[in-house]
């Protein structure tokens, strides 16, 4: 059975038209949510901690800014869009005391609710809306009159209207222009983490790095290795993004396509897939979440060590030099 997509024609804004929506945070996703909701004609306040460097940015965008406590106290819908590791503390100290019965608590990712790090009270609605793309792109496509696909889920329906509120919110940020799918907090959290770790971030970067190192160790110029293993990834991914595997293979040379079929299975073997299942198991059991939380609470020693190693890697130093020679690469669009 095909999943049902919800579009503008299926969704009414009425469940949130006369409500105040508090966006907690003003980072990559939060700035896009706040501005899109505002431009849809909805009432928005941005909640920021005292002294936040983001206050000026939000005010320059024409948004009203308040403390997290005041924003939560005033709002009917509270969307928590700060980093996962910071959410529980901010929630307990600044949100929970003002999250009275009848309000709605929302998330862009189900991590903290699914793993029990945030436990909302019984009298509030709890939902998530997750656009499937970065914040700067969510804002850009909205401003262009289009939308970004997304997903939504309801974890707690205290009012009997949580699903309608979630869908209305998705419409408010422009996602129903492209279509949204219904999911659960469990499914969103586990599949999102798995995709990031095994394919999108961990898988892709490890594959690129191994390919680059293989060529350089064999005596090839690092600059050539960079082009062949990293730079051209975007060209192929864009084709897959627009046309799928078949369309991509139709667009490349016969030599490249033949090599795809012959060598792909040597790179991603049954052993690789078995390890992917282990990765998924670590996510499902909460093992990954526990490791992430421990590192975060210790000041990220492991993650900072890995960042330092990669910062000094030849792939990064050569890449920076080459990218500086490419005026067609826009640095501004990647800023948050």
Curated annotation (Swiss-Prot):
<feature type="domain" description="KARI N-terminal Rossmann">
    <location>
        <begin position="3"/>
        <end position="183"/>
    </location>
</feature>
<comment type="pathway">
    <text>Amino-acid biosynthesis; L-valine biosynthesis; L-valine from pyruvate: step 2/4.</text>
</comment>
<dbReference type="InterPro" id="IPR014359">
    <property type="entry name" value="KARI_prok"/>
</dbReference>
<comment type="similarity">
    <text>Belongs to the ketol-acid reductoisomerase family.</text>
</comment>
<feature type="binding site">
    <location>
        <position position="232"/>
    </location>
    <ligand>
        <name>Mg(2+) 2</name>
    </ligand>
</feature>
<dbReference type="GO" id="GO:0000287">
    <property type="term" value="F:magnesium ion binding"/>
</dbReference>
<feature type="binding site">
    <location>
        <position position="54"/>
    </location>
    <ligand>
        <name>NADP(+)</name>
    </ligand>
</feature>
<keyword id="KW-0479">Metal-binding</keyword>
<feature type="binding site">
    <location>
        <begin position="84"/>
        <end position="87"/>
    </location>
    <ligand>
        <name>NADP(+)</name>
    </ligand>
</feature>
<protein>
    <recommendedName>
        <fullName>Ketol-acid reductoisomerase (NADP(+))</fullName>
        <ecNumber>1.1.1.86</ecNumber>
    </recommendedName>
</protein>
<feature type="binding site">
    <location>
        <begin position="26"/>
        <end position="29"/>
    </location>
    <ligand>
        <name>NADP(+)</name>
    </ligand>
</feature>
<feature type="binding site">
    <location>
        <position position="135"/>
    </location>
    <ligand>
        <name>NADP(+)</name>
    </ligand>
</feature>
<dbReference type="InterPro" id="IPR008927">
    <property type="entry name" value="6-PGluconate_DH-like_C_sf"/>
</dbReference>
<keyword id="KW-0028">Amino-acid biosynthesis</keyword>
<dbReference type="GO" id="GO:0004455">
    <property type="term" value="F:ketol-acid reductoisomerase activity"/>
</dbReference>
<keyword id="KW-0521">NADP</keyword>
<dbReference type="GO" id="GO:0005829">
    <property type="term" value="C:cytosol"/>
</dbReference>
<feature type="binding site">
    <location>
        <position position="192"/>
    </location>
    <ligand>
        <name>Mg(2+) 2</name>
    </ligand>
</feature>
<feature type="binding site">
    <location>
        <position position="49"/>
    </location>
    <ligand>
        <name>NADP(+)</name>
    </ligand>
</feature>
<comment type="function">
    <text>Involved in the biosynthesis of branched-chain amino acids (BCAA). Catalyzes an alkyl-migration followed by a ketol-acid reduction of (S)-2-acetolactate (S2AL) to yield (R)-2,3-dihydroxy-isovalerate. In the isomerase reaction, S2AL is rearranged via a Mg-dependent methyl migration to produce 3-hydroxy-3-methyl-2-ketobutyrate (HMKB). In the reductase reaction, this 2-ketoacid undergoes a metal-dependent reduction by NADPH to yield (R)-2,3-dihydroxy-isovalerate.</text>
</comment>
<feature type="domain" description="KARI C-terminal knotted">
    <location>
        <begin position="184"/>
        <end position="329"/>
    </location>
</feature>
<feature type="binding site">
    <location>
        <position position="52"/>
    </location>
    <ligand>
        <name>NADP(+)</name>
    </ligand>
</feature>
<dbReference type="InterPro" id="IPR013023">
    <property type="entry name" value="KARI"/>
</dbReference>
<feature type="active site">
    <location>
        <position position="109"/>
    </location>
</feature>
<dbReference type="GO" id="GO:0050661">
    <property type="term" value="F:NADP binding"/>
</dbReference>
<dbReference type="Pfam" id="PF01450">
    <property type="entry name" value="KARI_C"/>
</dbReference>
<feature type="binding site">
    <location>
        <position position="253"/>
    </location>
    <ligand>
        <name>substrate</name>
    </ligand>
</feature>
<dbReference type="GO" id="GO:0009099">
    <property type="term" value="P:L-valine biosynthetic process"/>
</dbReference>
<dbReference type="InterPro" id="IPR000506">
    <property type="entry name" value="KARI_C"/>
</dbReference>
<feature type="binding site">
    <location>
        <position position="228"/>
    </location>
    <ligand>
        <name>Mg(2+) 2</name>
    </ligand>
</feature>
<keyword id="KW-0460">Magnesium</keyword>
<keyword id="KW-0560">Oxidoreductase</keyword>
<feature type="binding site">
    <location>
        <position position="192"/>
    </location>
    <ligand>
        <name>Mg(2+) 1</name>
    </ligand>
</feature>
<dbReference type="InterPro" id="IPR013116">
    <property type="entry name" value="KARI_N"/>
</dbReference>
<feature type="binding site">
    <location>
        <position position="196"/>
    </location>
    <ligand>
        <name>Mg(2+) 1</name>
    </ligand>
</feature>
<dbReference type="InterPro" id="IPR036291">
    <property type="entry name" value="NAD(P)-bd_dom_sf"/>
</dbReference>
<dbReference type="GO" id="GO:0009097">
    <property type="term" value="P:isoleucine biosynthetic process"/>
</dbReference>
<keyword id="KW-0100">Branched-chain amino acid biosynthesis</keyword>
<dbReference type="Pfam" id="PF07991">
    <property type="entry name" value="KARI_N"/>
</dbReference>
<comment type="pathway">
    <text>Amino-acid biosynthesis; L-isoleucine biosynthesis; L-isoleucine from 2-oxobutanoate: step 2/4.</text>
</comment>
């Amino acid at each position: 059975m095909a999943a049902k997509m919800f579009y503008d024609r299926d969704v009414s804004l009425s469940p949130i038209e006369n409500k105040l929506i508090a966006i907690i945070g003003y980072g990559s996703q939060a700035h896009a949510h706040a501005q899109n909701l505002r431009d849809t004609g909805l009432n928005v306040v941005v909640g920021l901690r005292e002294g936040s460097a983001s206050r000026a940015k939000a005010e320059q965008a024409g948004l009203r800014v308040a403390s997290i406590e005041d924003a939560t106290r005033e709002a009917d819908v509270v969307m928590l869009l700060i980093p996962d590791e910071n959410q529980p503390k901010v929630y307990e100290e600044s949100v929970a005391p003002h999250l009275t019965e009848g309000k709605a608590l929302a998330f862009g990712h189900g991590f903290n609710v699914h793993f029990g790090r945030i436990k909302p009270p019984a009298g509030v609605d709890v939902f998530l809306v997750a656009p499937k793309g970065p914040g700067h792109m969510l804002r850009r496509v909205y401003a262009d009159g289009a939308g970004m696909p997304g997903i939504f889920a309801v974890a707690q329906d205290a009012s009997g209207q949580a699903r309608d509120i979630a869908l209305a919110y998705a419409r408010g940020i422009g996602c129903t222009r492209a279509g949204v799918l219904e999911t659960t907090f469990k499914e969103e959290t586990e599949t999102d983490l798995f995709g990031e770790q095994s394919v999108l971030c961990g898988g892709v970067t490890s594959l690129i790095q191994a390919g680059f190192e293989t060529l350089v160790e064999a005596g090839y110029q690092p600059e050539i290795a960079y082009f062949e293993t990293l730079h051209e990834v975007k060209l192929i991914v864009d084709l897959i993004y627009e046309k799928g595997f078949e369309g991509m293979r139709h667009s490349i040379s016969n030599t490249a396509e033949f090599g795809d079929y012959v060598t792909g299975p040597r790179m991603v073997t049954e052993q690789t897939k078995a390890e992917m299942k282990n990765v998924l198991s670590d996510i499902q059991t909460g093992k990954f979440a526990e490791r992430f939380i421990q590192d975060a609470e210790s000041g990220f020693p492991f993650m900072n060590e890995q960042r330092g190693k990669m910062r000094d890697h030849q792939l990064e130093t050569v890449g920076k030099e080459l990218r500086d020679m490419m005026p067609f690469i826009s640095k501004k669009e990647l800023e948050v």
